[in-house]
C-alpha cells in the first residue's frame, strides 16, 4: 500500500460479487485440488456453496457429474465466475 491507496482486491468484501453471480456458471477449486464446475445456487458467509448441474474434475480429468452438490466452506480455495 502506497500513499494509503488500497491495491486491487484488498479489503473488499466478496459477498457483493458472489450475490451478483448466483445462477451463473462458476468454477470452485478446493484445497485438495479437486475442481467443481456448475451453476451457483447459493453461498453463505462461511463460503458454504450449493451448485447445480455440477461436474467434478480431478487432475484436470472429468470424474463425475452431479445434479446438486454442496461444498463446505472451509474446503474452498476460490470461486471464479466462468
Swiss-Prot record:
Role description: Component of LSm protein complexes, which are involved in RNA processing and may function in a chaperone-like manner, facilitating the efficient association of RNA processing factors with their substrates. Component of the cytoplasmic LSM1-LSM7 complex, which is thought to be involved in mRNA degradation by activating the decapping step in the 5'-to-3' mRNA decay pathway. Component of the nuclear LSM2-LSM8 complex, which is involved in splicing of nuclear mRNAs.
Gene3D superfamilies the UniProt entry points to: 2.30.30.100
Gene Ontology molecular function, alphabetical: RNA binding
Signal sequence, renumbered to the chain: none
Domain Sm, first and last residues per copy: 13-82
Annotated InterPro entries: Lsm6/sSmF (IPR016487), LSM_dom_sf (IPR010920), Sm (IPR047575), Sm_dom_euk/arc (IPR001163)
Keywords: Cytoplasm, mRNA processing, mRNA splicing, Nucleus, Ribonucleoprotein, RNA-binding, rRNA processing, Spliceosome, tRNA processing
Record's subunit section: Component of the heptameric LSM1-LSM7 complex, which consists of LSM1, LSM2, LSM3, LSM4, LSM5, LSM6 and LSM7. Component of the heptameric LSM2-LSM8 complex, which consists of LSM2, LSM3, LSM4, LSM5, LSM6, LSM7 and LSM8. The LSm subunits form a seven-membered ring structure with a doughnut shape.
Protein name: U6 snRNA-associated Sm-like protein LSm6
PANTHER family attached to this UniProt entry: SMALL NUCLEAR RIBONUCLEOPROTEIN F SNRNP-F, U6 SNRNA-ASSOCIATED SM-LIKE PROTEIN LSM6
Family the UniProt entry places it in: Belongs to the snRNP Sm proteins family. SmF/LSm6 subfamily.
Locations listed in the record: Cytoplasm; Nucleus
GO BP, sorted A to Z: maturation of SSU-rRNA; mRNA splicing, via spliceosome; tRNA processing
GO CC, one annotated term: P-body
SMART domains, alphabetized: Sm (SM00651)
Species annotation: Chaetomium globosum (strain ATCC 6205 / CBS 148.51 / DSM 1962 / NBRC 6347 / NRRL 1970)
